[in-house]
């Protein structure tokens, strides 16, 4: 997300808040102005080197926005009514006795400075004059009636410590606690921010939500209660629409504008890896909180409730600790941190001390600094990961949000937890789930001393957006003012956790080795990276001793450096990315390109899971993939067949028109992937827990796959569409589970394309030179779609396709036909057909004995499976060869006879010709390809319903895994083909019916003596009838 620091200006040069006063007072005020002016210049100088050129243009075309503290606004109002001297005294007293909110350092924007139409760098929606949002941050401070106050002192110099290190990249969005685990900041319970209302500020309605807020660490001396939080920088809050007729008052918190947090950073000092709270409530008030941790990365949120009886809340953090930020230099660390288990989530009974010794602070600071660049897989001469502006955000659960789109949207954690809390009304699970939220929420879940704004909240978290299970927290206790307490949140059901490790198991487009990172324009291995760098820096000139067409792979990449270097250039490696001065580090201009590619990979994964879950739900309970069999998992220990994804190229910006083959092409032959468009599809999102009971309505349960889950509140309820869980209503608890989008669509760029790009892959033709290739029948619907189109095939399907040798099949076929008719005047064509089928059966047996799943079975089980599937596979083989290899209907033999090749697929029954053509047309309409063919062949072979199988469990596991791989493959590579998986599965019974008729015909011929005996074909016919 594009963010940049706007210098905090003290007050505008043409404004004077003090009128006639004593000369001493005027002199002090003049010094104060000069001091702030000097700080402003320093901040601008420090800011300049971090600006991207687009930001510089935006900053140059937009006026700098002055910010005023509320104490100055109070002095301005007081001056007009009670005089300058009394006003200065009142402000000084307010400075030493600030209210319990400790927002003395909060800067707001006055509406008169904005003219109702200024936007920062064009990234936020234009600001409009609206009622201020009096919500405070539930994680930062607790707002109550100002009957008691705490002494705070604002140190403006701290702005320099917390505001000048923003490099506007993904590195600044992580912190590294003492336990070493990286935490994505977007997963922290997200706060809601707004201006603070002051009774003495009569022009409150003229203020708007700030575009930039900054909260400095405080050092109060309160002992009754404390909230320990890291200093937080907030950037770019987008104001939401609100009813203009709604009145704004401190008693009606939830009726004003609420801001959407688009980007923020957290700096952690000392040993603060989490937030701890201790809350003191007034008499008659109740407070309850619970925490739940997801099976993946979800953590429980904290609910706090403060009564109307003088709460004391302080914010404490030592200013001596110099906060540092950890860095992520690769997508591997980003995904690893999102998958890694987090530190234990604090609950309401956990209290952390704010006092640490200077030695501990120094140790923590040294630990965080030393860990800044650990774990990065980029070598020192790689391109530095310059994360410039492009309008993308990645949340903790891999969600993707394009903030440049005209459609407001969100992806990430679903609803969950309880009803609204005191400050922003968001549900606990929704906060803990991660992701971005649009928050106009309403009243709280239960009353407290008659105050509807101080409700109890159940914080049963529902894990992450992928549906991890969460444990429900206890509901709130009812106060004297209202007998209804919050109900307990129920645990969420476990879903499949997203595994991002497969994103990095890609193959080098040059040699096929495993990639190590982005090098000189695209993902390559370490060997090709070093070879390319040495060639360019040393200006080497190679020659090829062959025909300049040497095959380059992992085993022989060093044989011909000429052809290897040419292939590096062909796949898209950039000469200009290599530094001629031999200095370490790459060219920063490629940084945005790398970040854009990483963000799209996570977006692809999210969309893949959503679509796959939707299809599985529509298919019902029939499709239930089981874990991979031990034998297959041992052969591929790092494989996740359900979530495999391959993106071999960065984007069209990093490659030439004739660009790199995909990883499947490296394994199976060259592929022209320049025209096919694909998008990945989702996995199971799980089911979220139920929210706590609302003030006037019971709890609601949101299902991870519900299309429109809503609560039972008596006000307008917010619903989750698409594949999201139900949202919480104004007066009711929120439902849980799923990934939520406000319109059910995941959009790309600024257009309205749905989550499944209407850019399918053409049929994969099996030619003499390649196993898989695209046709250009379909095209991507947008430029953004074209950037993420390379073929993504799971390793299982790649392994299946490698086991098929169509060239050998056709060679053996025509060789047998010519051999049988050599020096023969005339032959029996039916007998010749039986010999060809017998040869095909031998080929089937040889193929099956060397395939995964099948080779682990005992011989008896193998024979039973082959005896019940051979005819179906023969029909499918012939359909495949007609569609993909252009097998003709007939061929002329050496003796001049015409042999009907189609009879091989009909098993000698000419009456089935029309039926056979109908099946072929159905498969072609479904864009039947090699991946579909091998999966369907395995589904026919691994039939767990065959009687007499001893190791039925292995067969069933293999069948389910293949079925899941086919489902994932069809959704991944053919999103534009409706119900392709269902169509392919439905064709299998039709093939079987046709094969049964062919078997009966062959058996009849055999009994009549017209067919040859003592052949494998006849043995199969008899064995099936005996069984």
Swiss-Prot record:
Start-end of NR C4-type zinc fingers = 508-528, 544-568
Q: Which CDD domains has this protein been placed in?
A: NR_DBD_Lrh-1_like, NR_LBD_Ftz-F1_like
- Hey, what tissues is this thing expressed in? Expression in the parasegmental primordia of the embryonic blastoderm.
DNA-binding region, residue intervals: 505-580
Q: PROSITE patterns attached here?
A: NR_LBD, NUCLEAR_REC_DBD_1, NUCLEAR_REC_DBD_2
**Localisation:** Nucleus
Q: Locate the NR LBD domain: which residues?
A: 792-1024
Q: What is the effect of changing residue 587 to Q?
A: 10-fold less reduced binding
What family is it from?
Belongs to the nuclear hormone receptor family. NR5 subfamily.
The entry's protein name is Nuclear hormone receptor FTZ-F1
